[in-house]
């Protein structure tokens, strides 16, 4: 209902939108076995179901304007990591959703793009680094994959993708190579996890993180109220 209201307000103030970006995202960390089912579901509700609701609210406008819908995905869409099961599942889901939507609306002149983003300097990522298990997740990645990018730089890249109606945009650009080799990632991640997780368990460092960042906590509070 809130998205429908936002779509209506956008039309009244600015006219029919020709570009829509589905960007809302929250994250929790920790083992799946001990995760709170409601918190796990909340991540999927915001990241995946919320993206679908965004598309549903604005799709009539995009059909009228032959517009462009950009779905924000993640490196997690290409390769899942341990301790982030809800986030990885939701980001894999938004990738599949965007591919499906693209196939449905292409003949109507609507373009659908997917943005694959790595670590961005936001409150969510800064908060994640406070938790040993998530900090280890990032620091065990190859050096180029550990780097964070400023939100302004990423936004500029996304604007260029919007202007060109890209079907895919990668930030950083080398994520294209991950796309090509994504089938090789699960065994590599599993091998690394078998080596590192026992040590983290022994250090009692595998507890749940709760919602990450101010945005995640605000989303959690909103979900609790509803």
How would you label these PLM feature ranges?
Residues 32-33, 81-85:
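Active-site loop immediately N-terminal to the catalytic Tyr-X3-Lys motif
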Residues 55, 90:
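Active-site helix of classical SDR
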């Amino acid at each position: 209902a809130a998205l429908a209201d936002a779509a209506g307000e956008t039309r009244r103030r600015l006219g029919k939108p020709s570009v829509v970006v589905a960007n809302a995202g929250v994250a929790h960390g920790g083992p799946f076995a001990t995760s709170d089912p409601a918190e796990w579901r909340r991540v999927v509700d915001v990241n995946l179901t919320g993206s679908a609701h965004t598309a549903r609210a604005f799709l009539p406008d995009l059909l009228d304007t032959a517009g462009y819908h950009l779905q924000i995905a993640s490196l997690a869409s290409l390769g899942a990591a341990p301790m982030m099961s809800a986030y990885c599942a939701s980001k894999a889901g938004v990738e599949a959703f965007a591919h499906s939507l693209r196939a449905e609306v292409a003949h109507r002149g609507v373009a659908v793009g997917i943005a694959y983003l790595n670590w961005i300097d936001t409150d969510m990522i800064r908060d994640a680094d406070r938790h040993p298990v998530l900090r280890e997740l990032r620091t065990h990645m190859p050096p180029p994959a550990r780097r964070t990018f400023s939100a302004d730089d990423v936004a500029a890249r996304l604007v260029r993708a919007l202007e060109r109606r890209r079907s895919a945009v990668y930030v950083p650009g080398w994520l294209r190579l991950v796309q090509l080799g994504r089938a090789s990632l699960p065994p590599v991640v599993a091998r690394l996890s078998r080596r590192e997780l026992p040590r983290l368990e022994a250090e009692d460092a595998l507890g749940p993180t709760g919602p990450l960042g101010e945005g995640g906590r605000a989303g959690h509070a909103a979900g609790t109220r509803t």
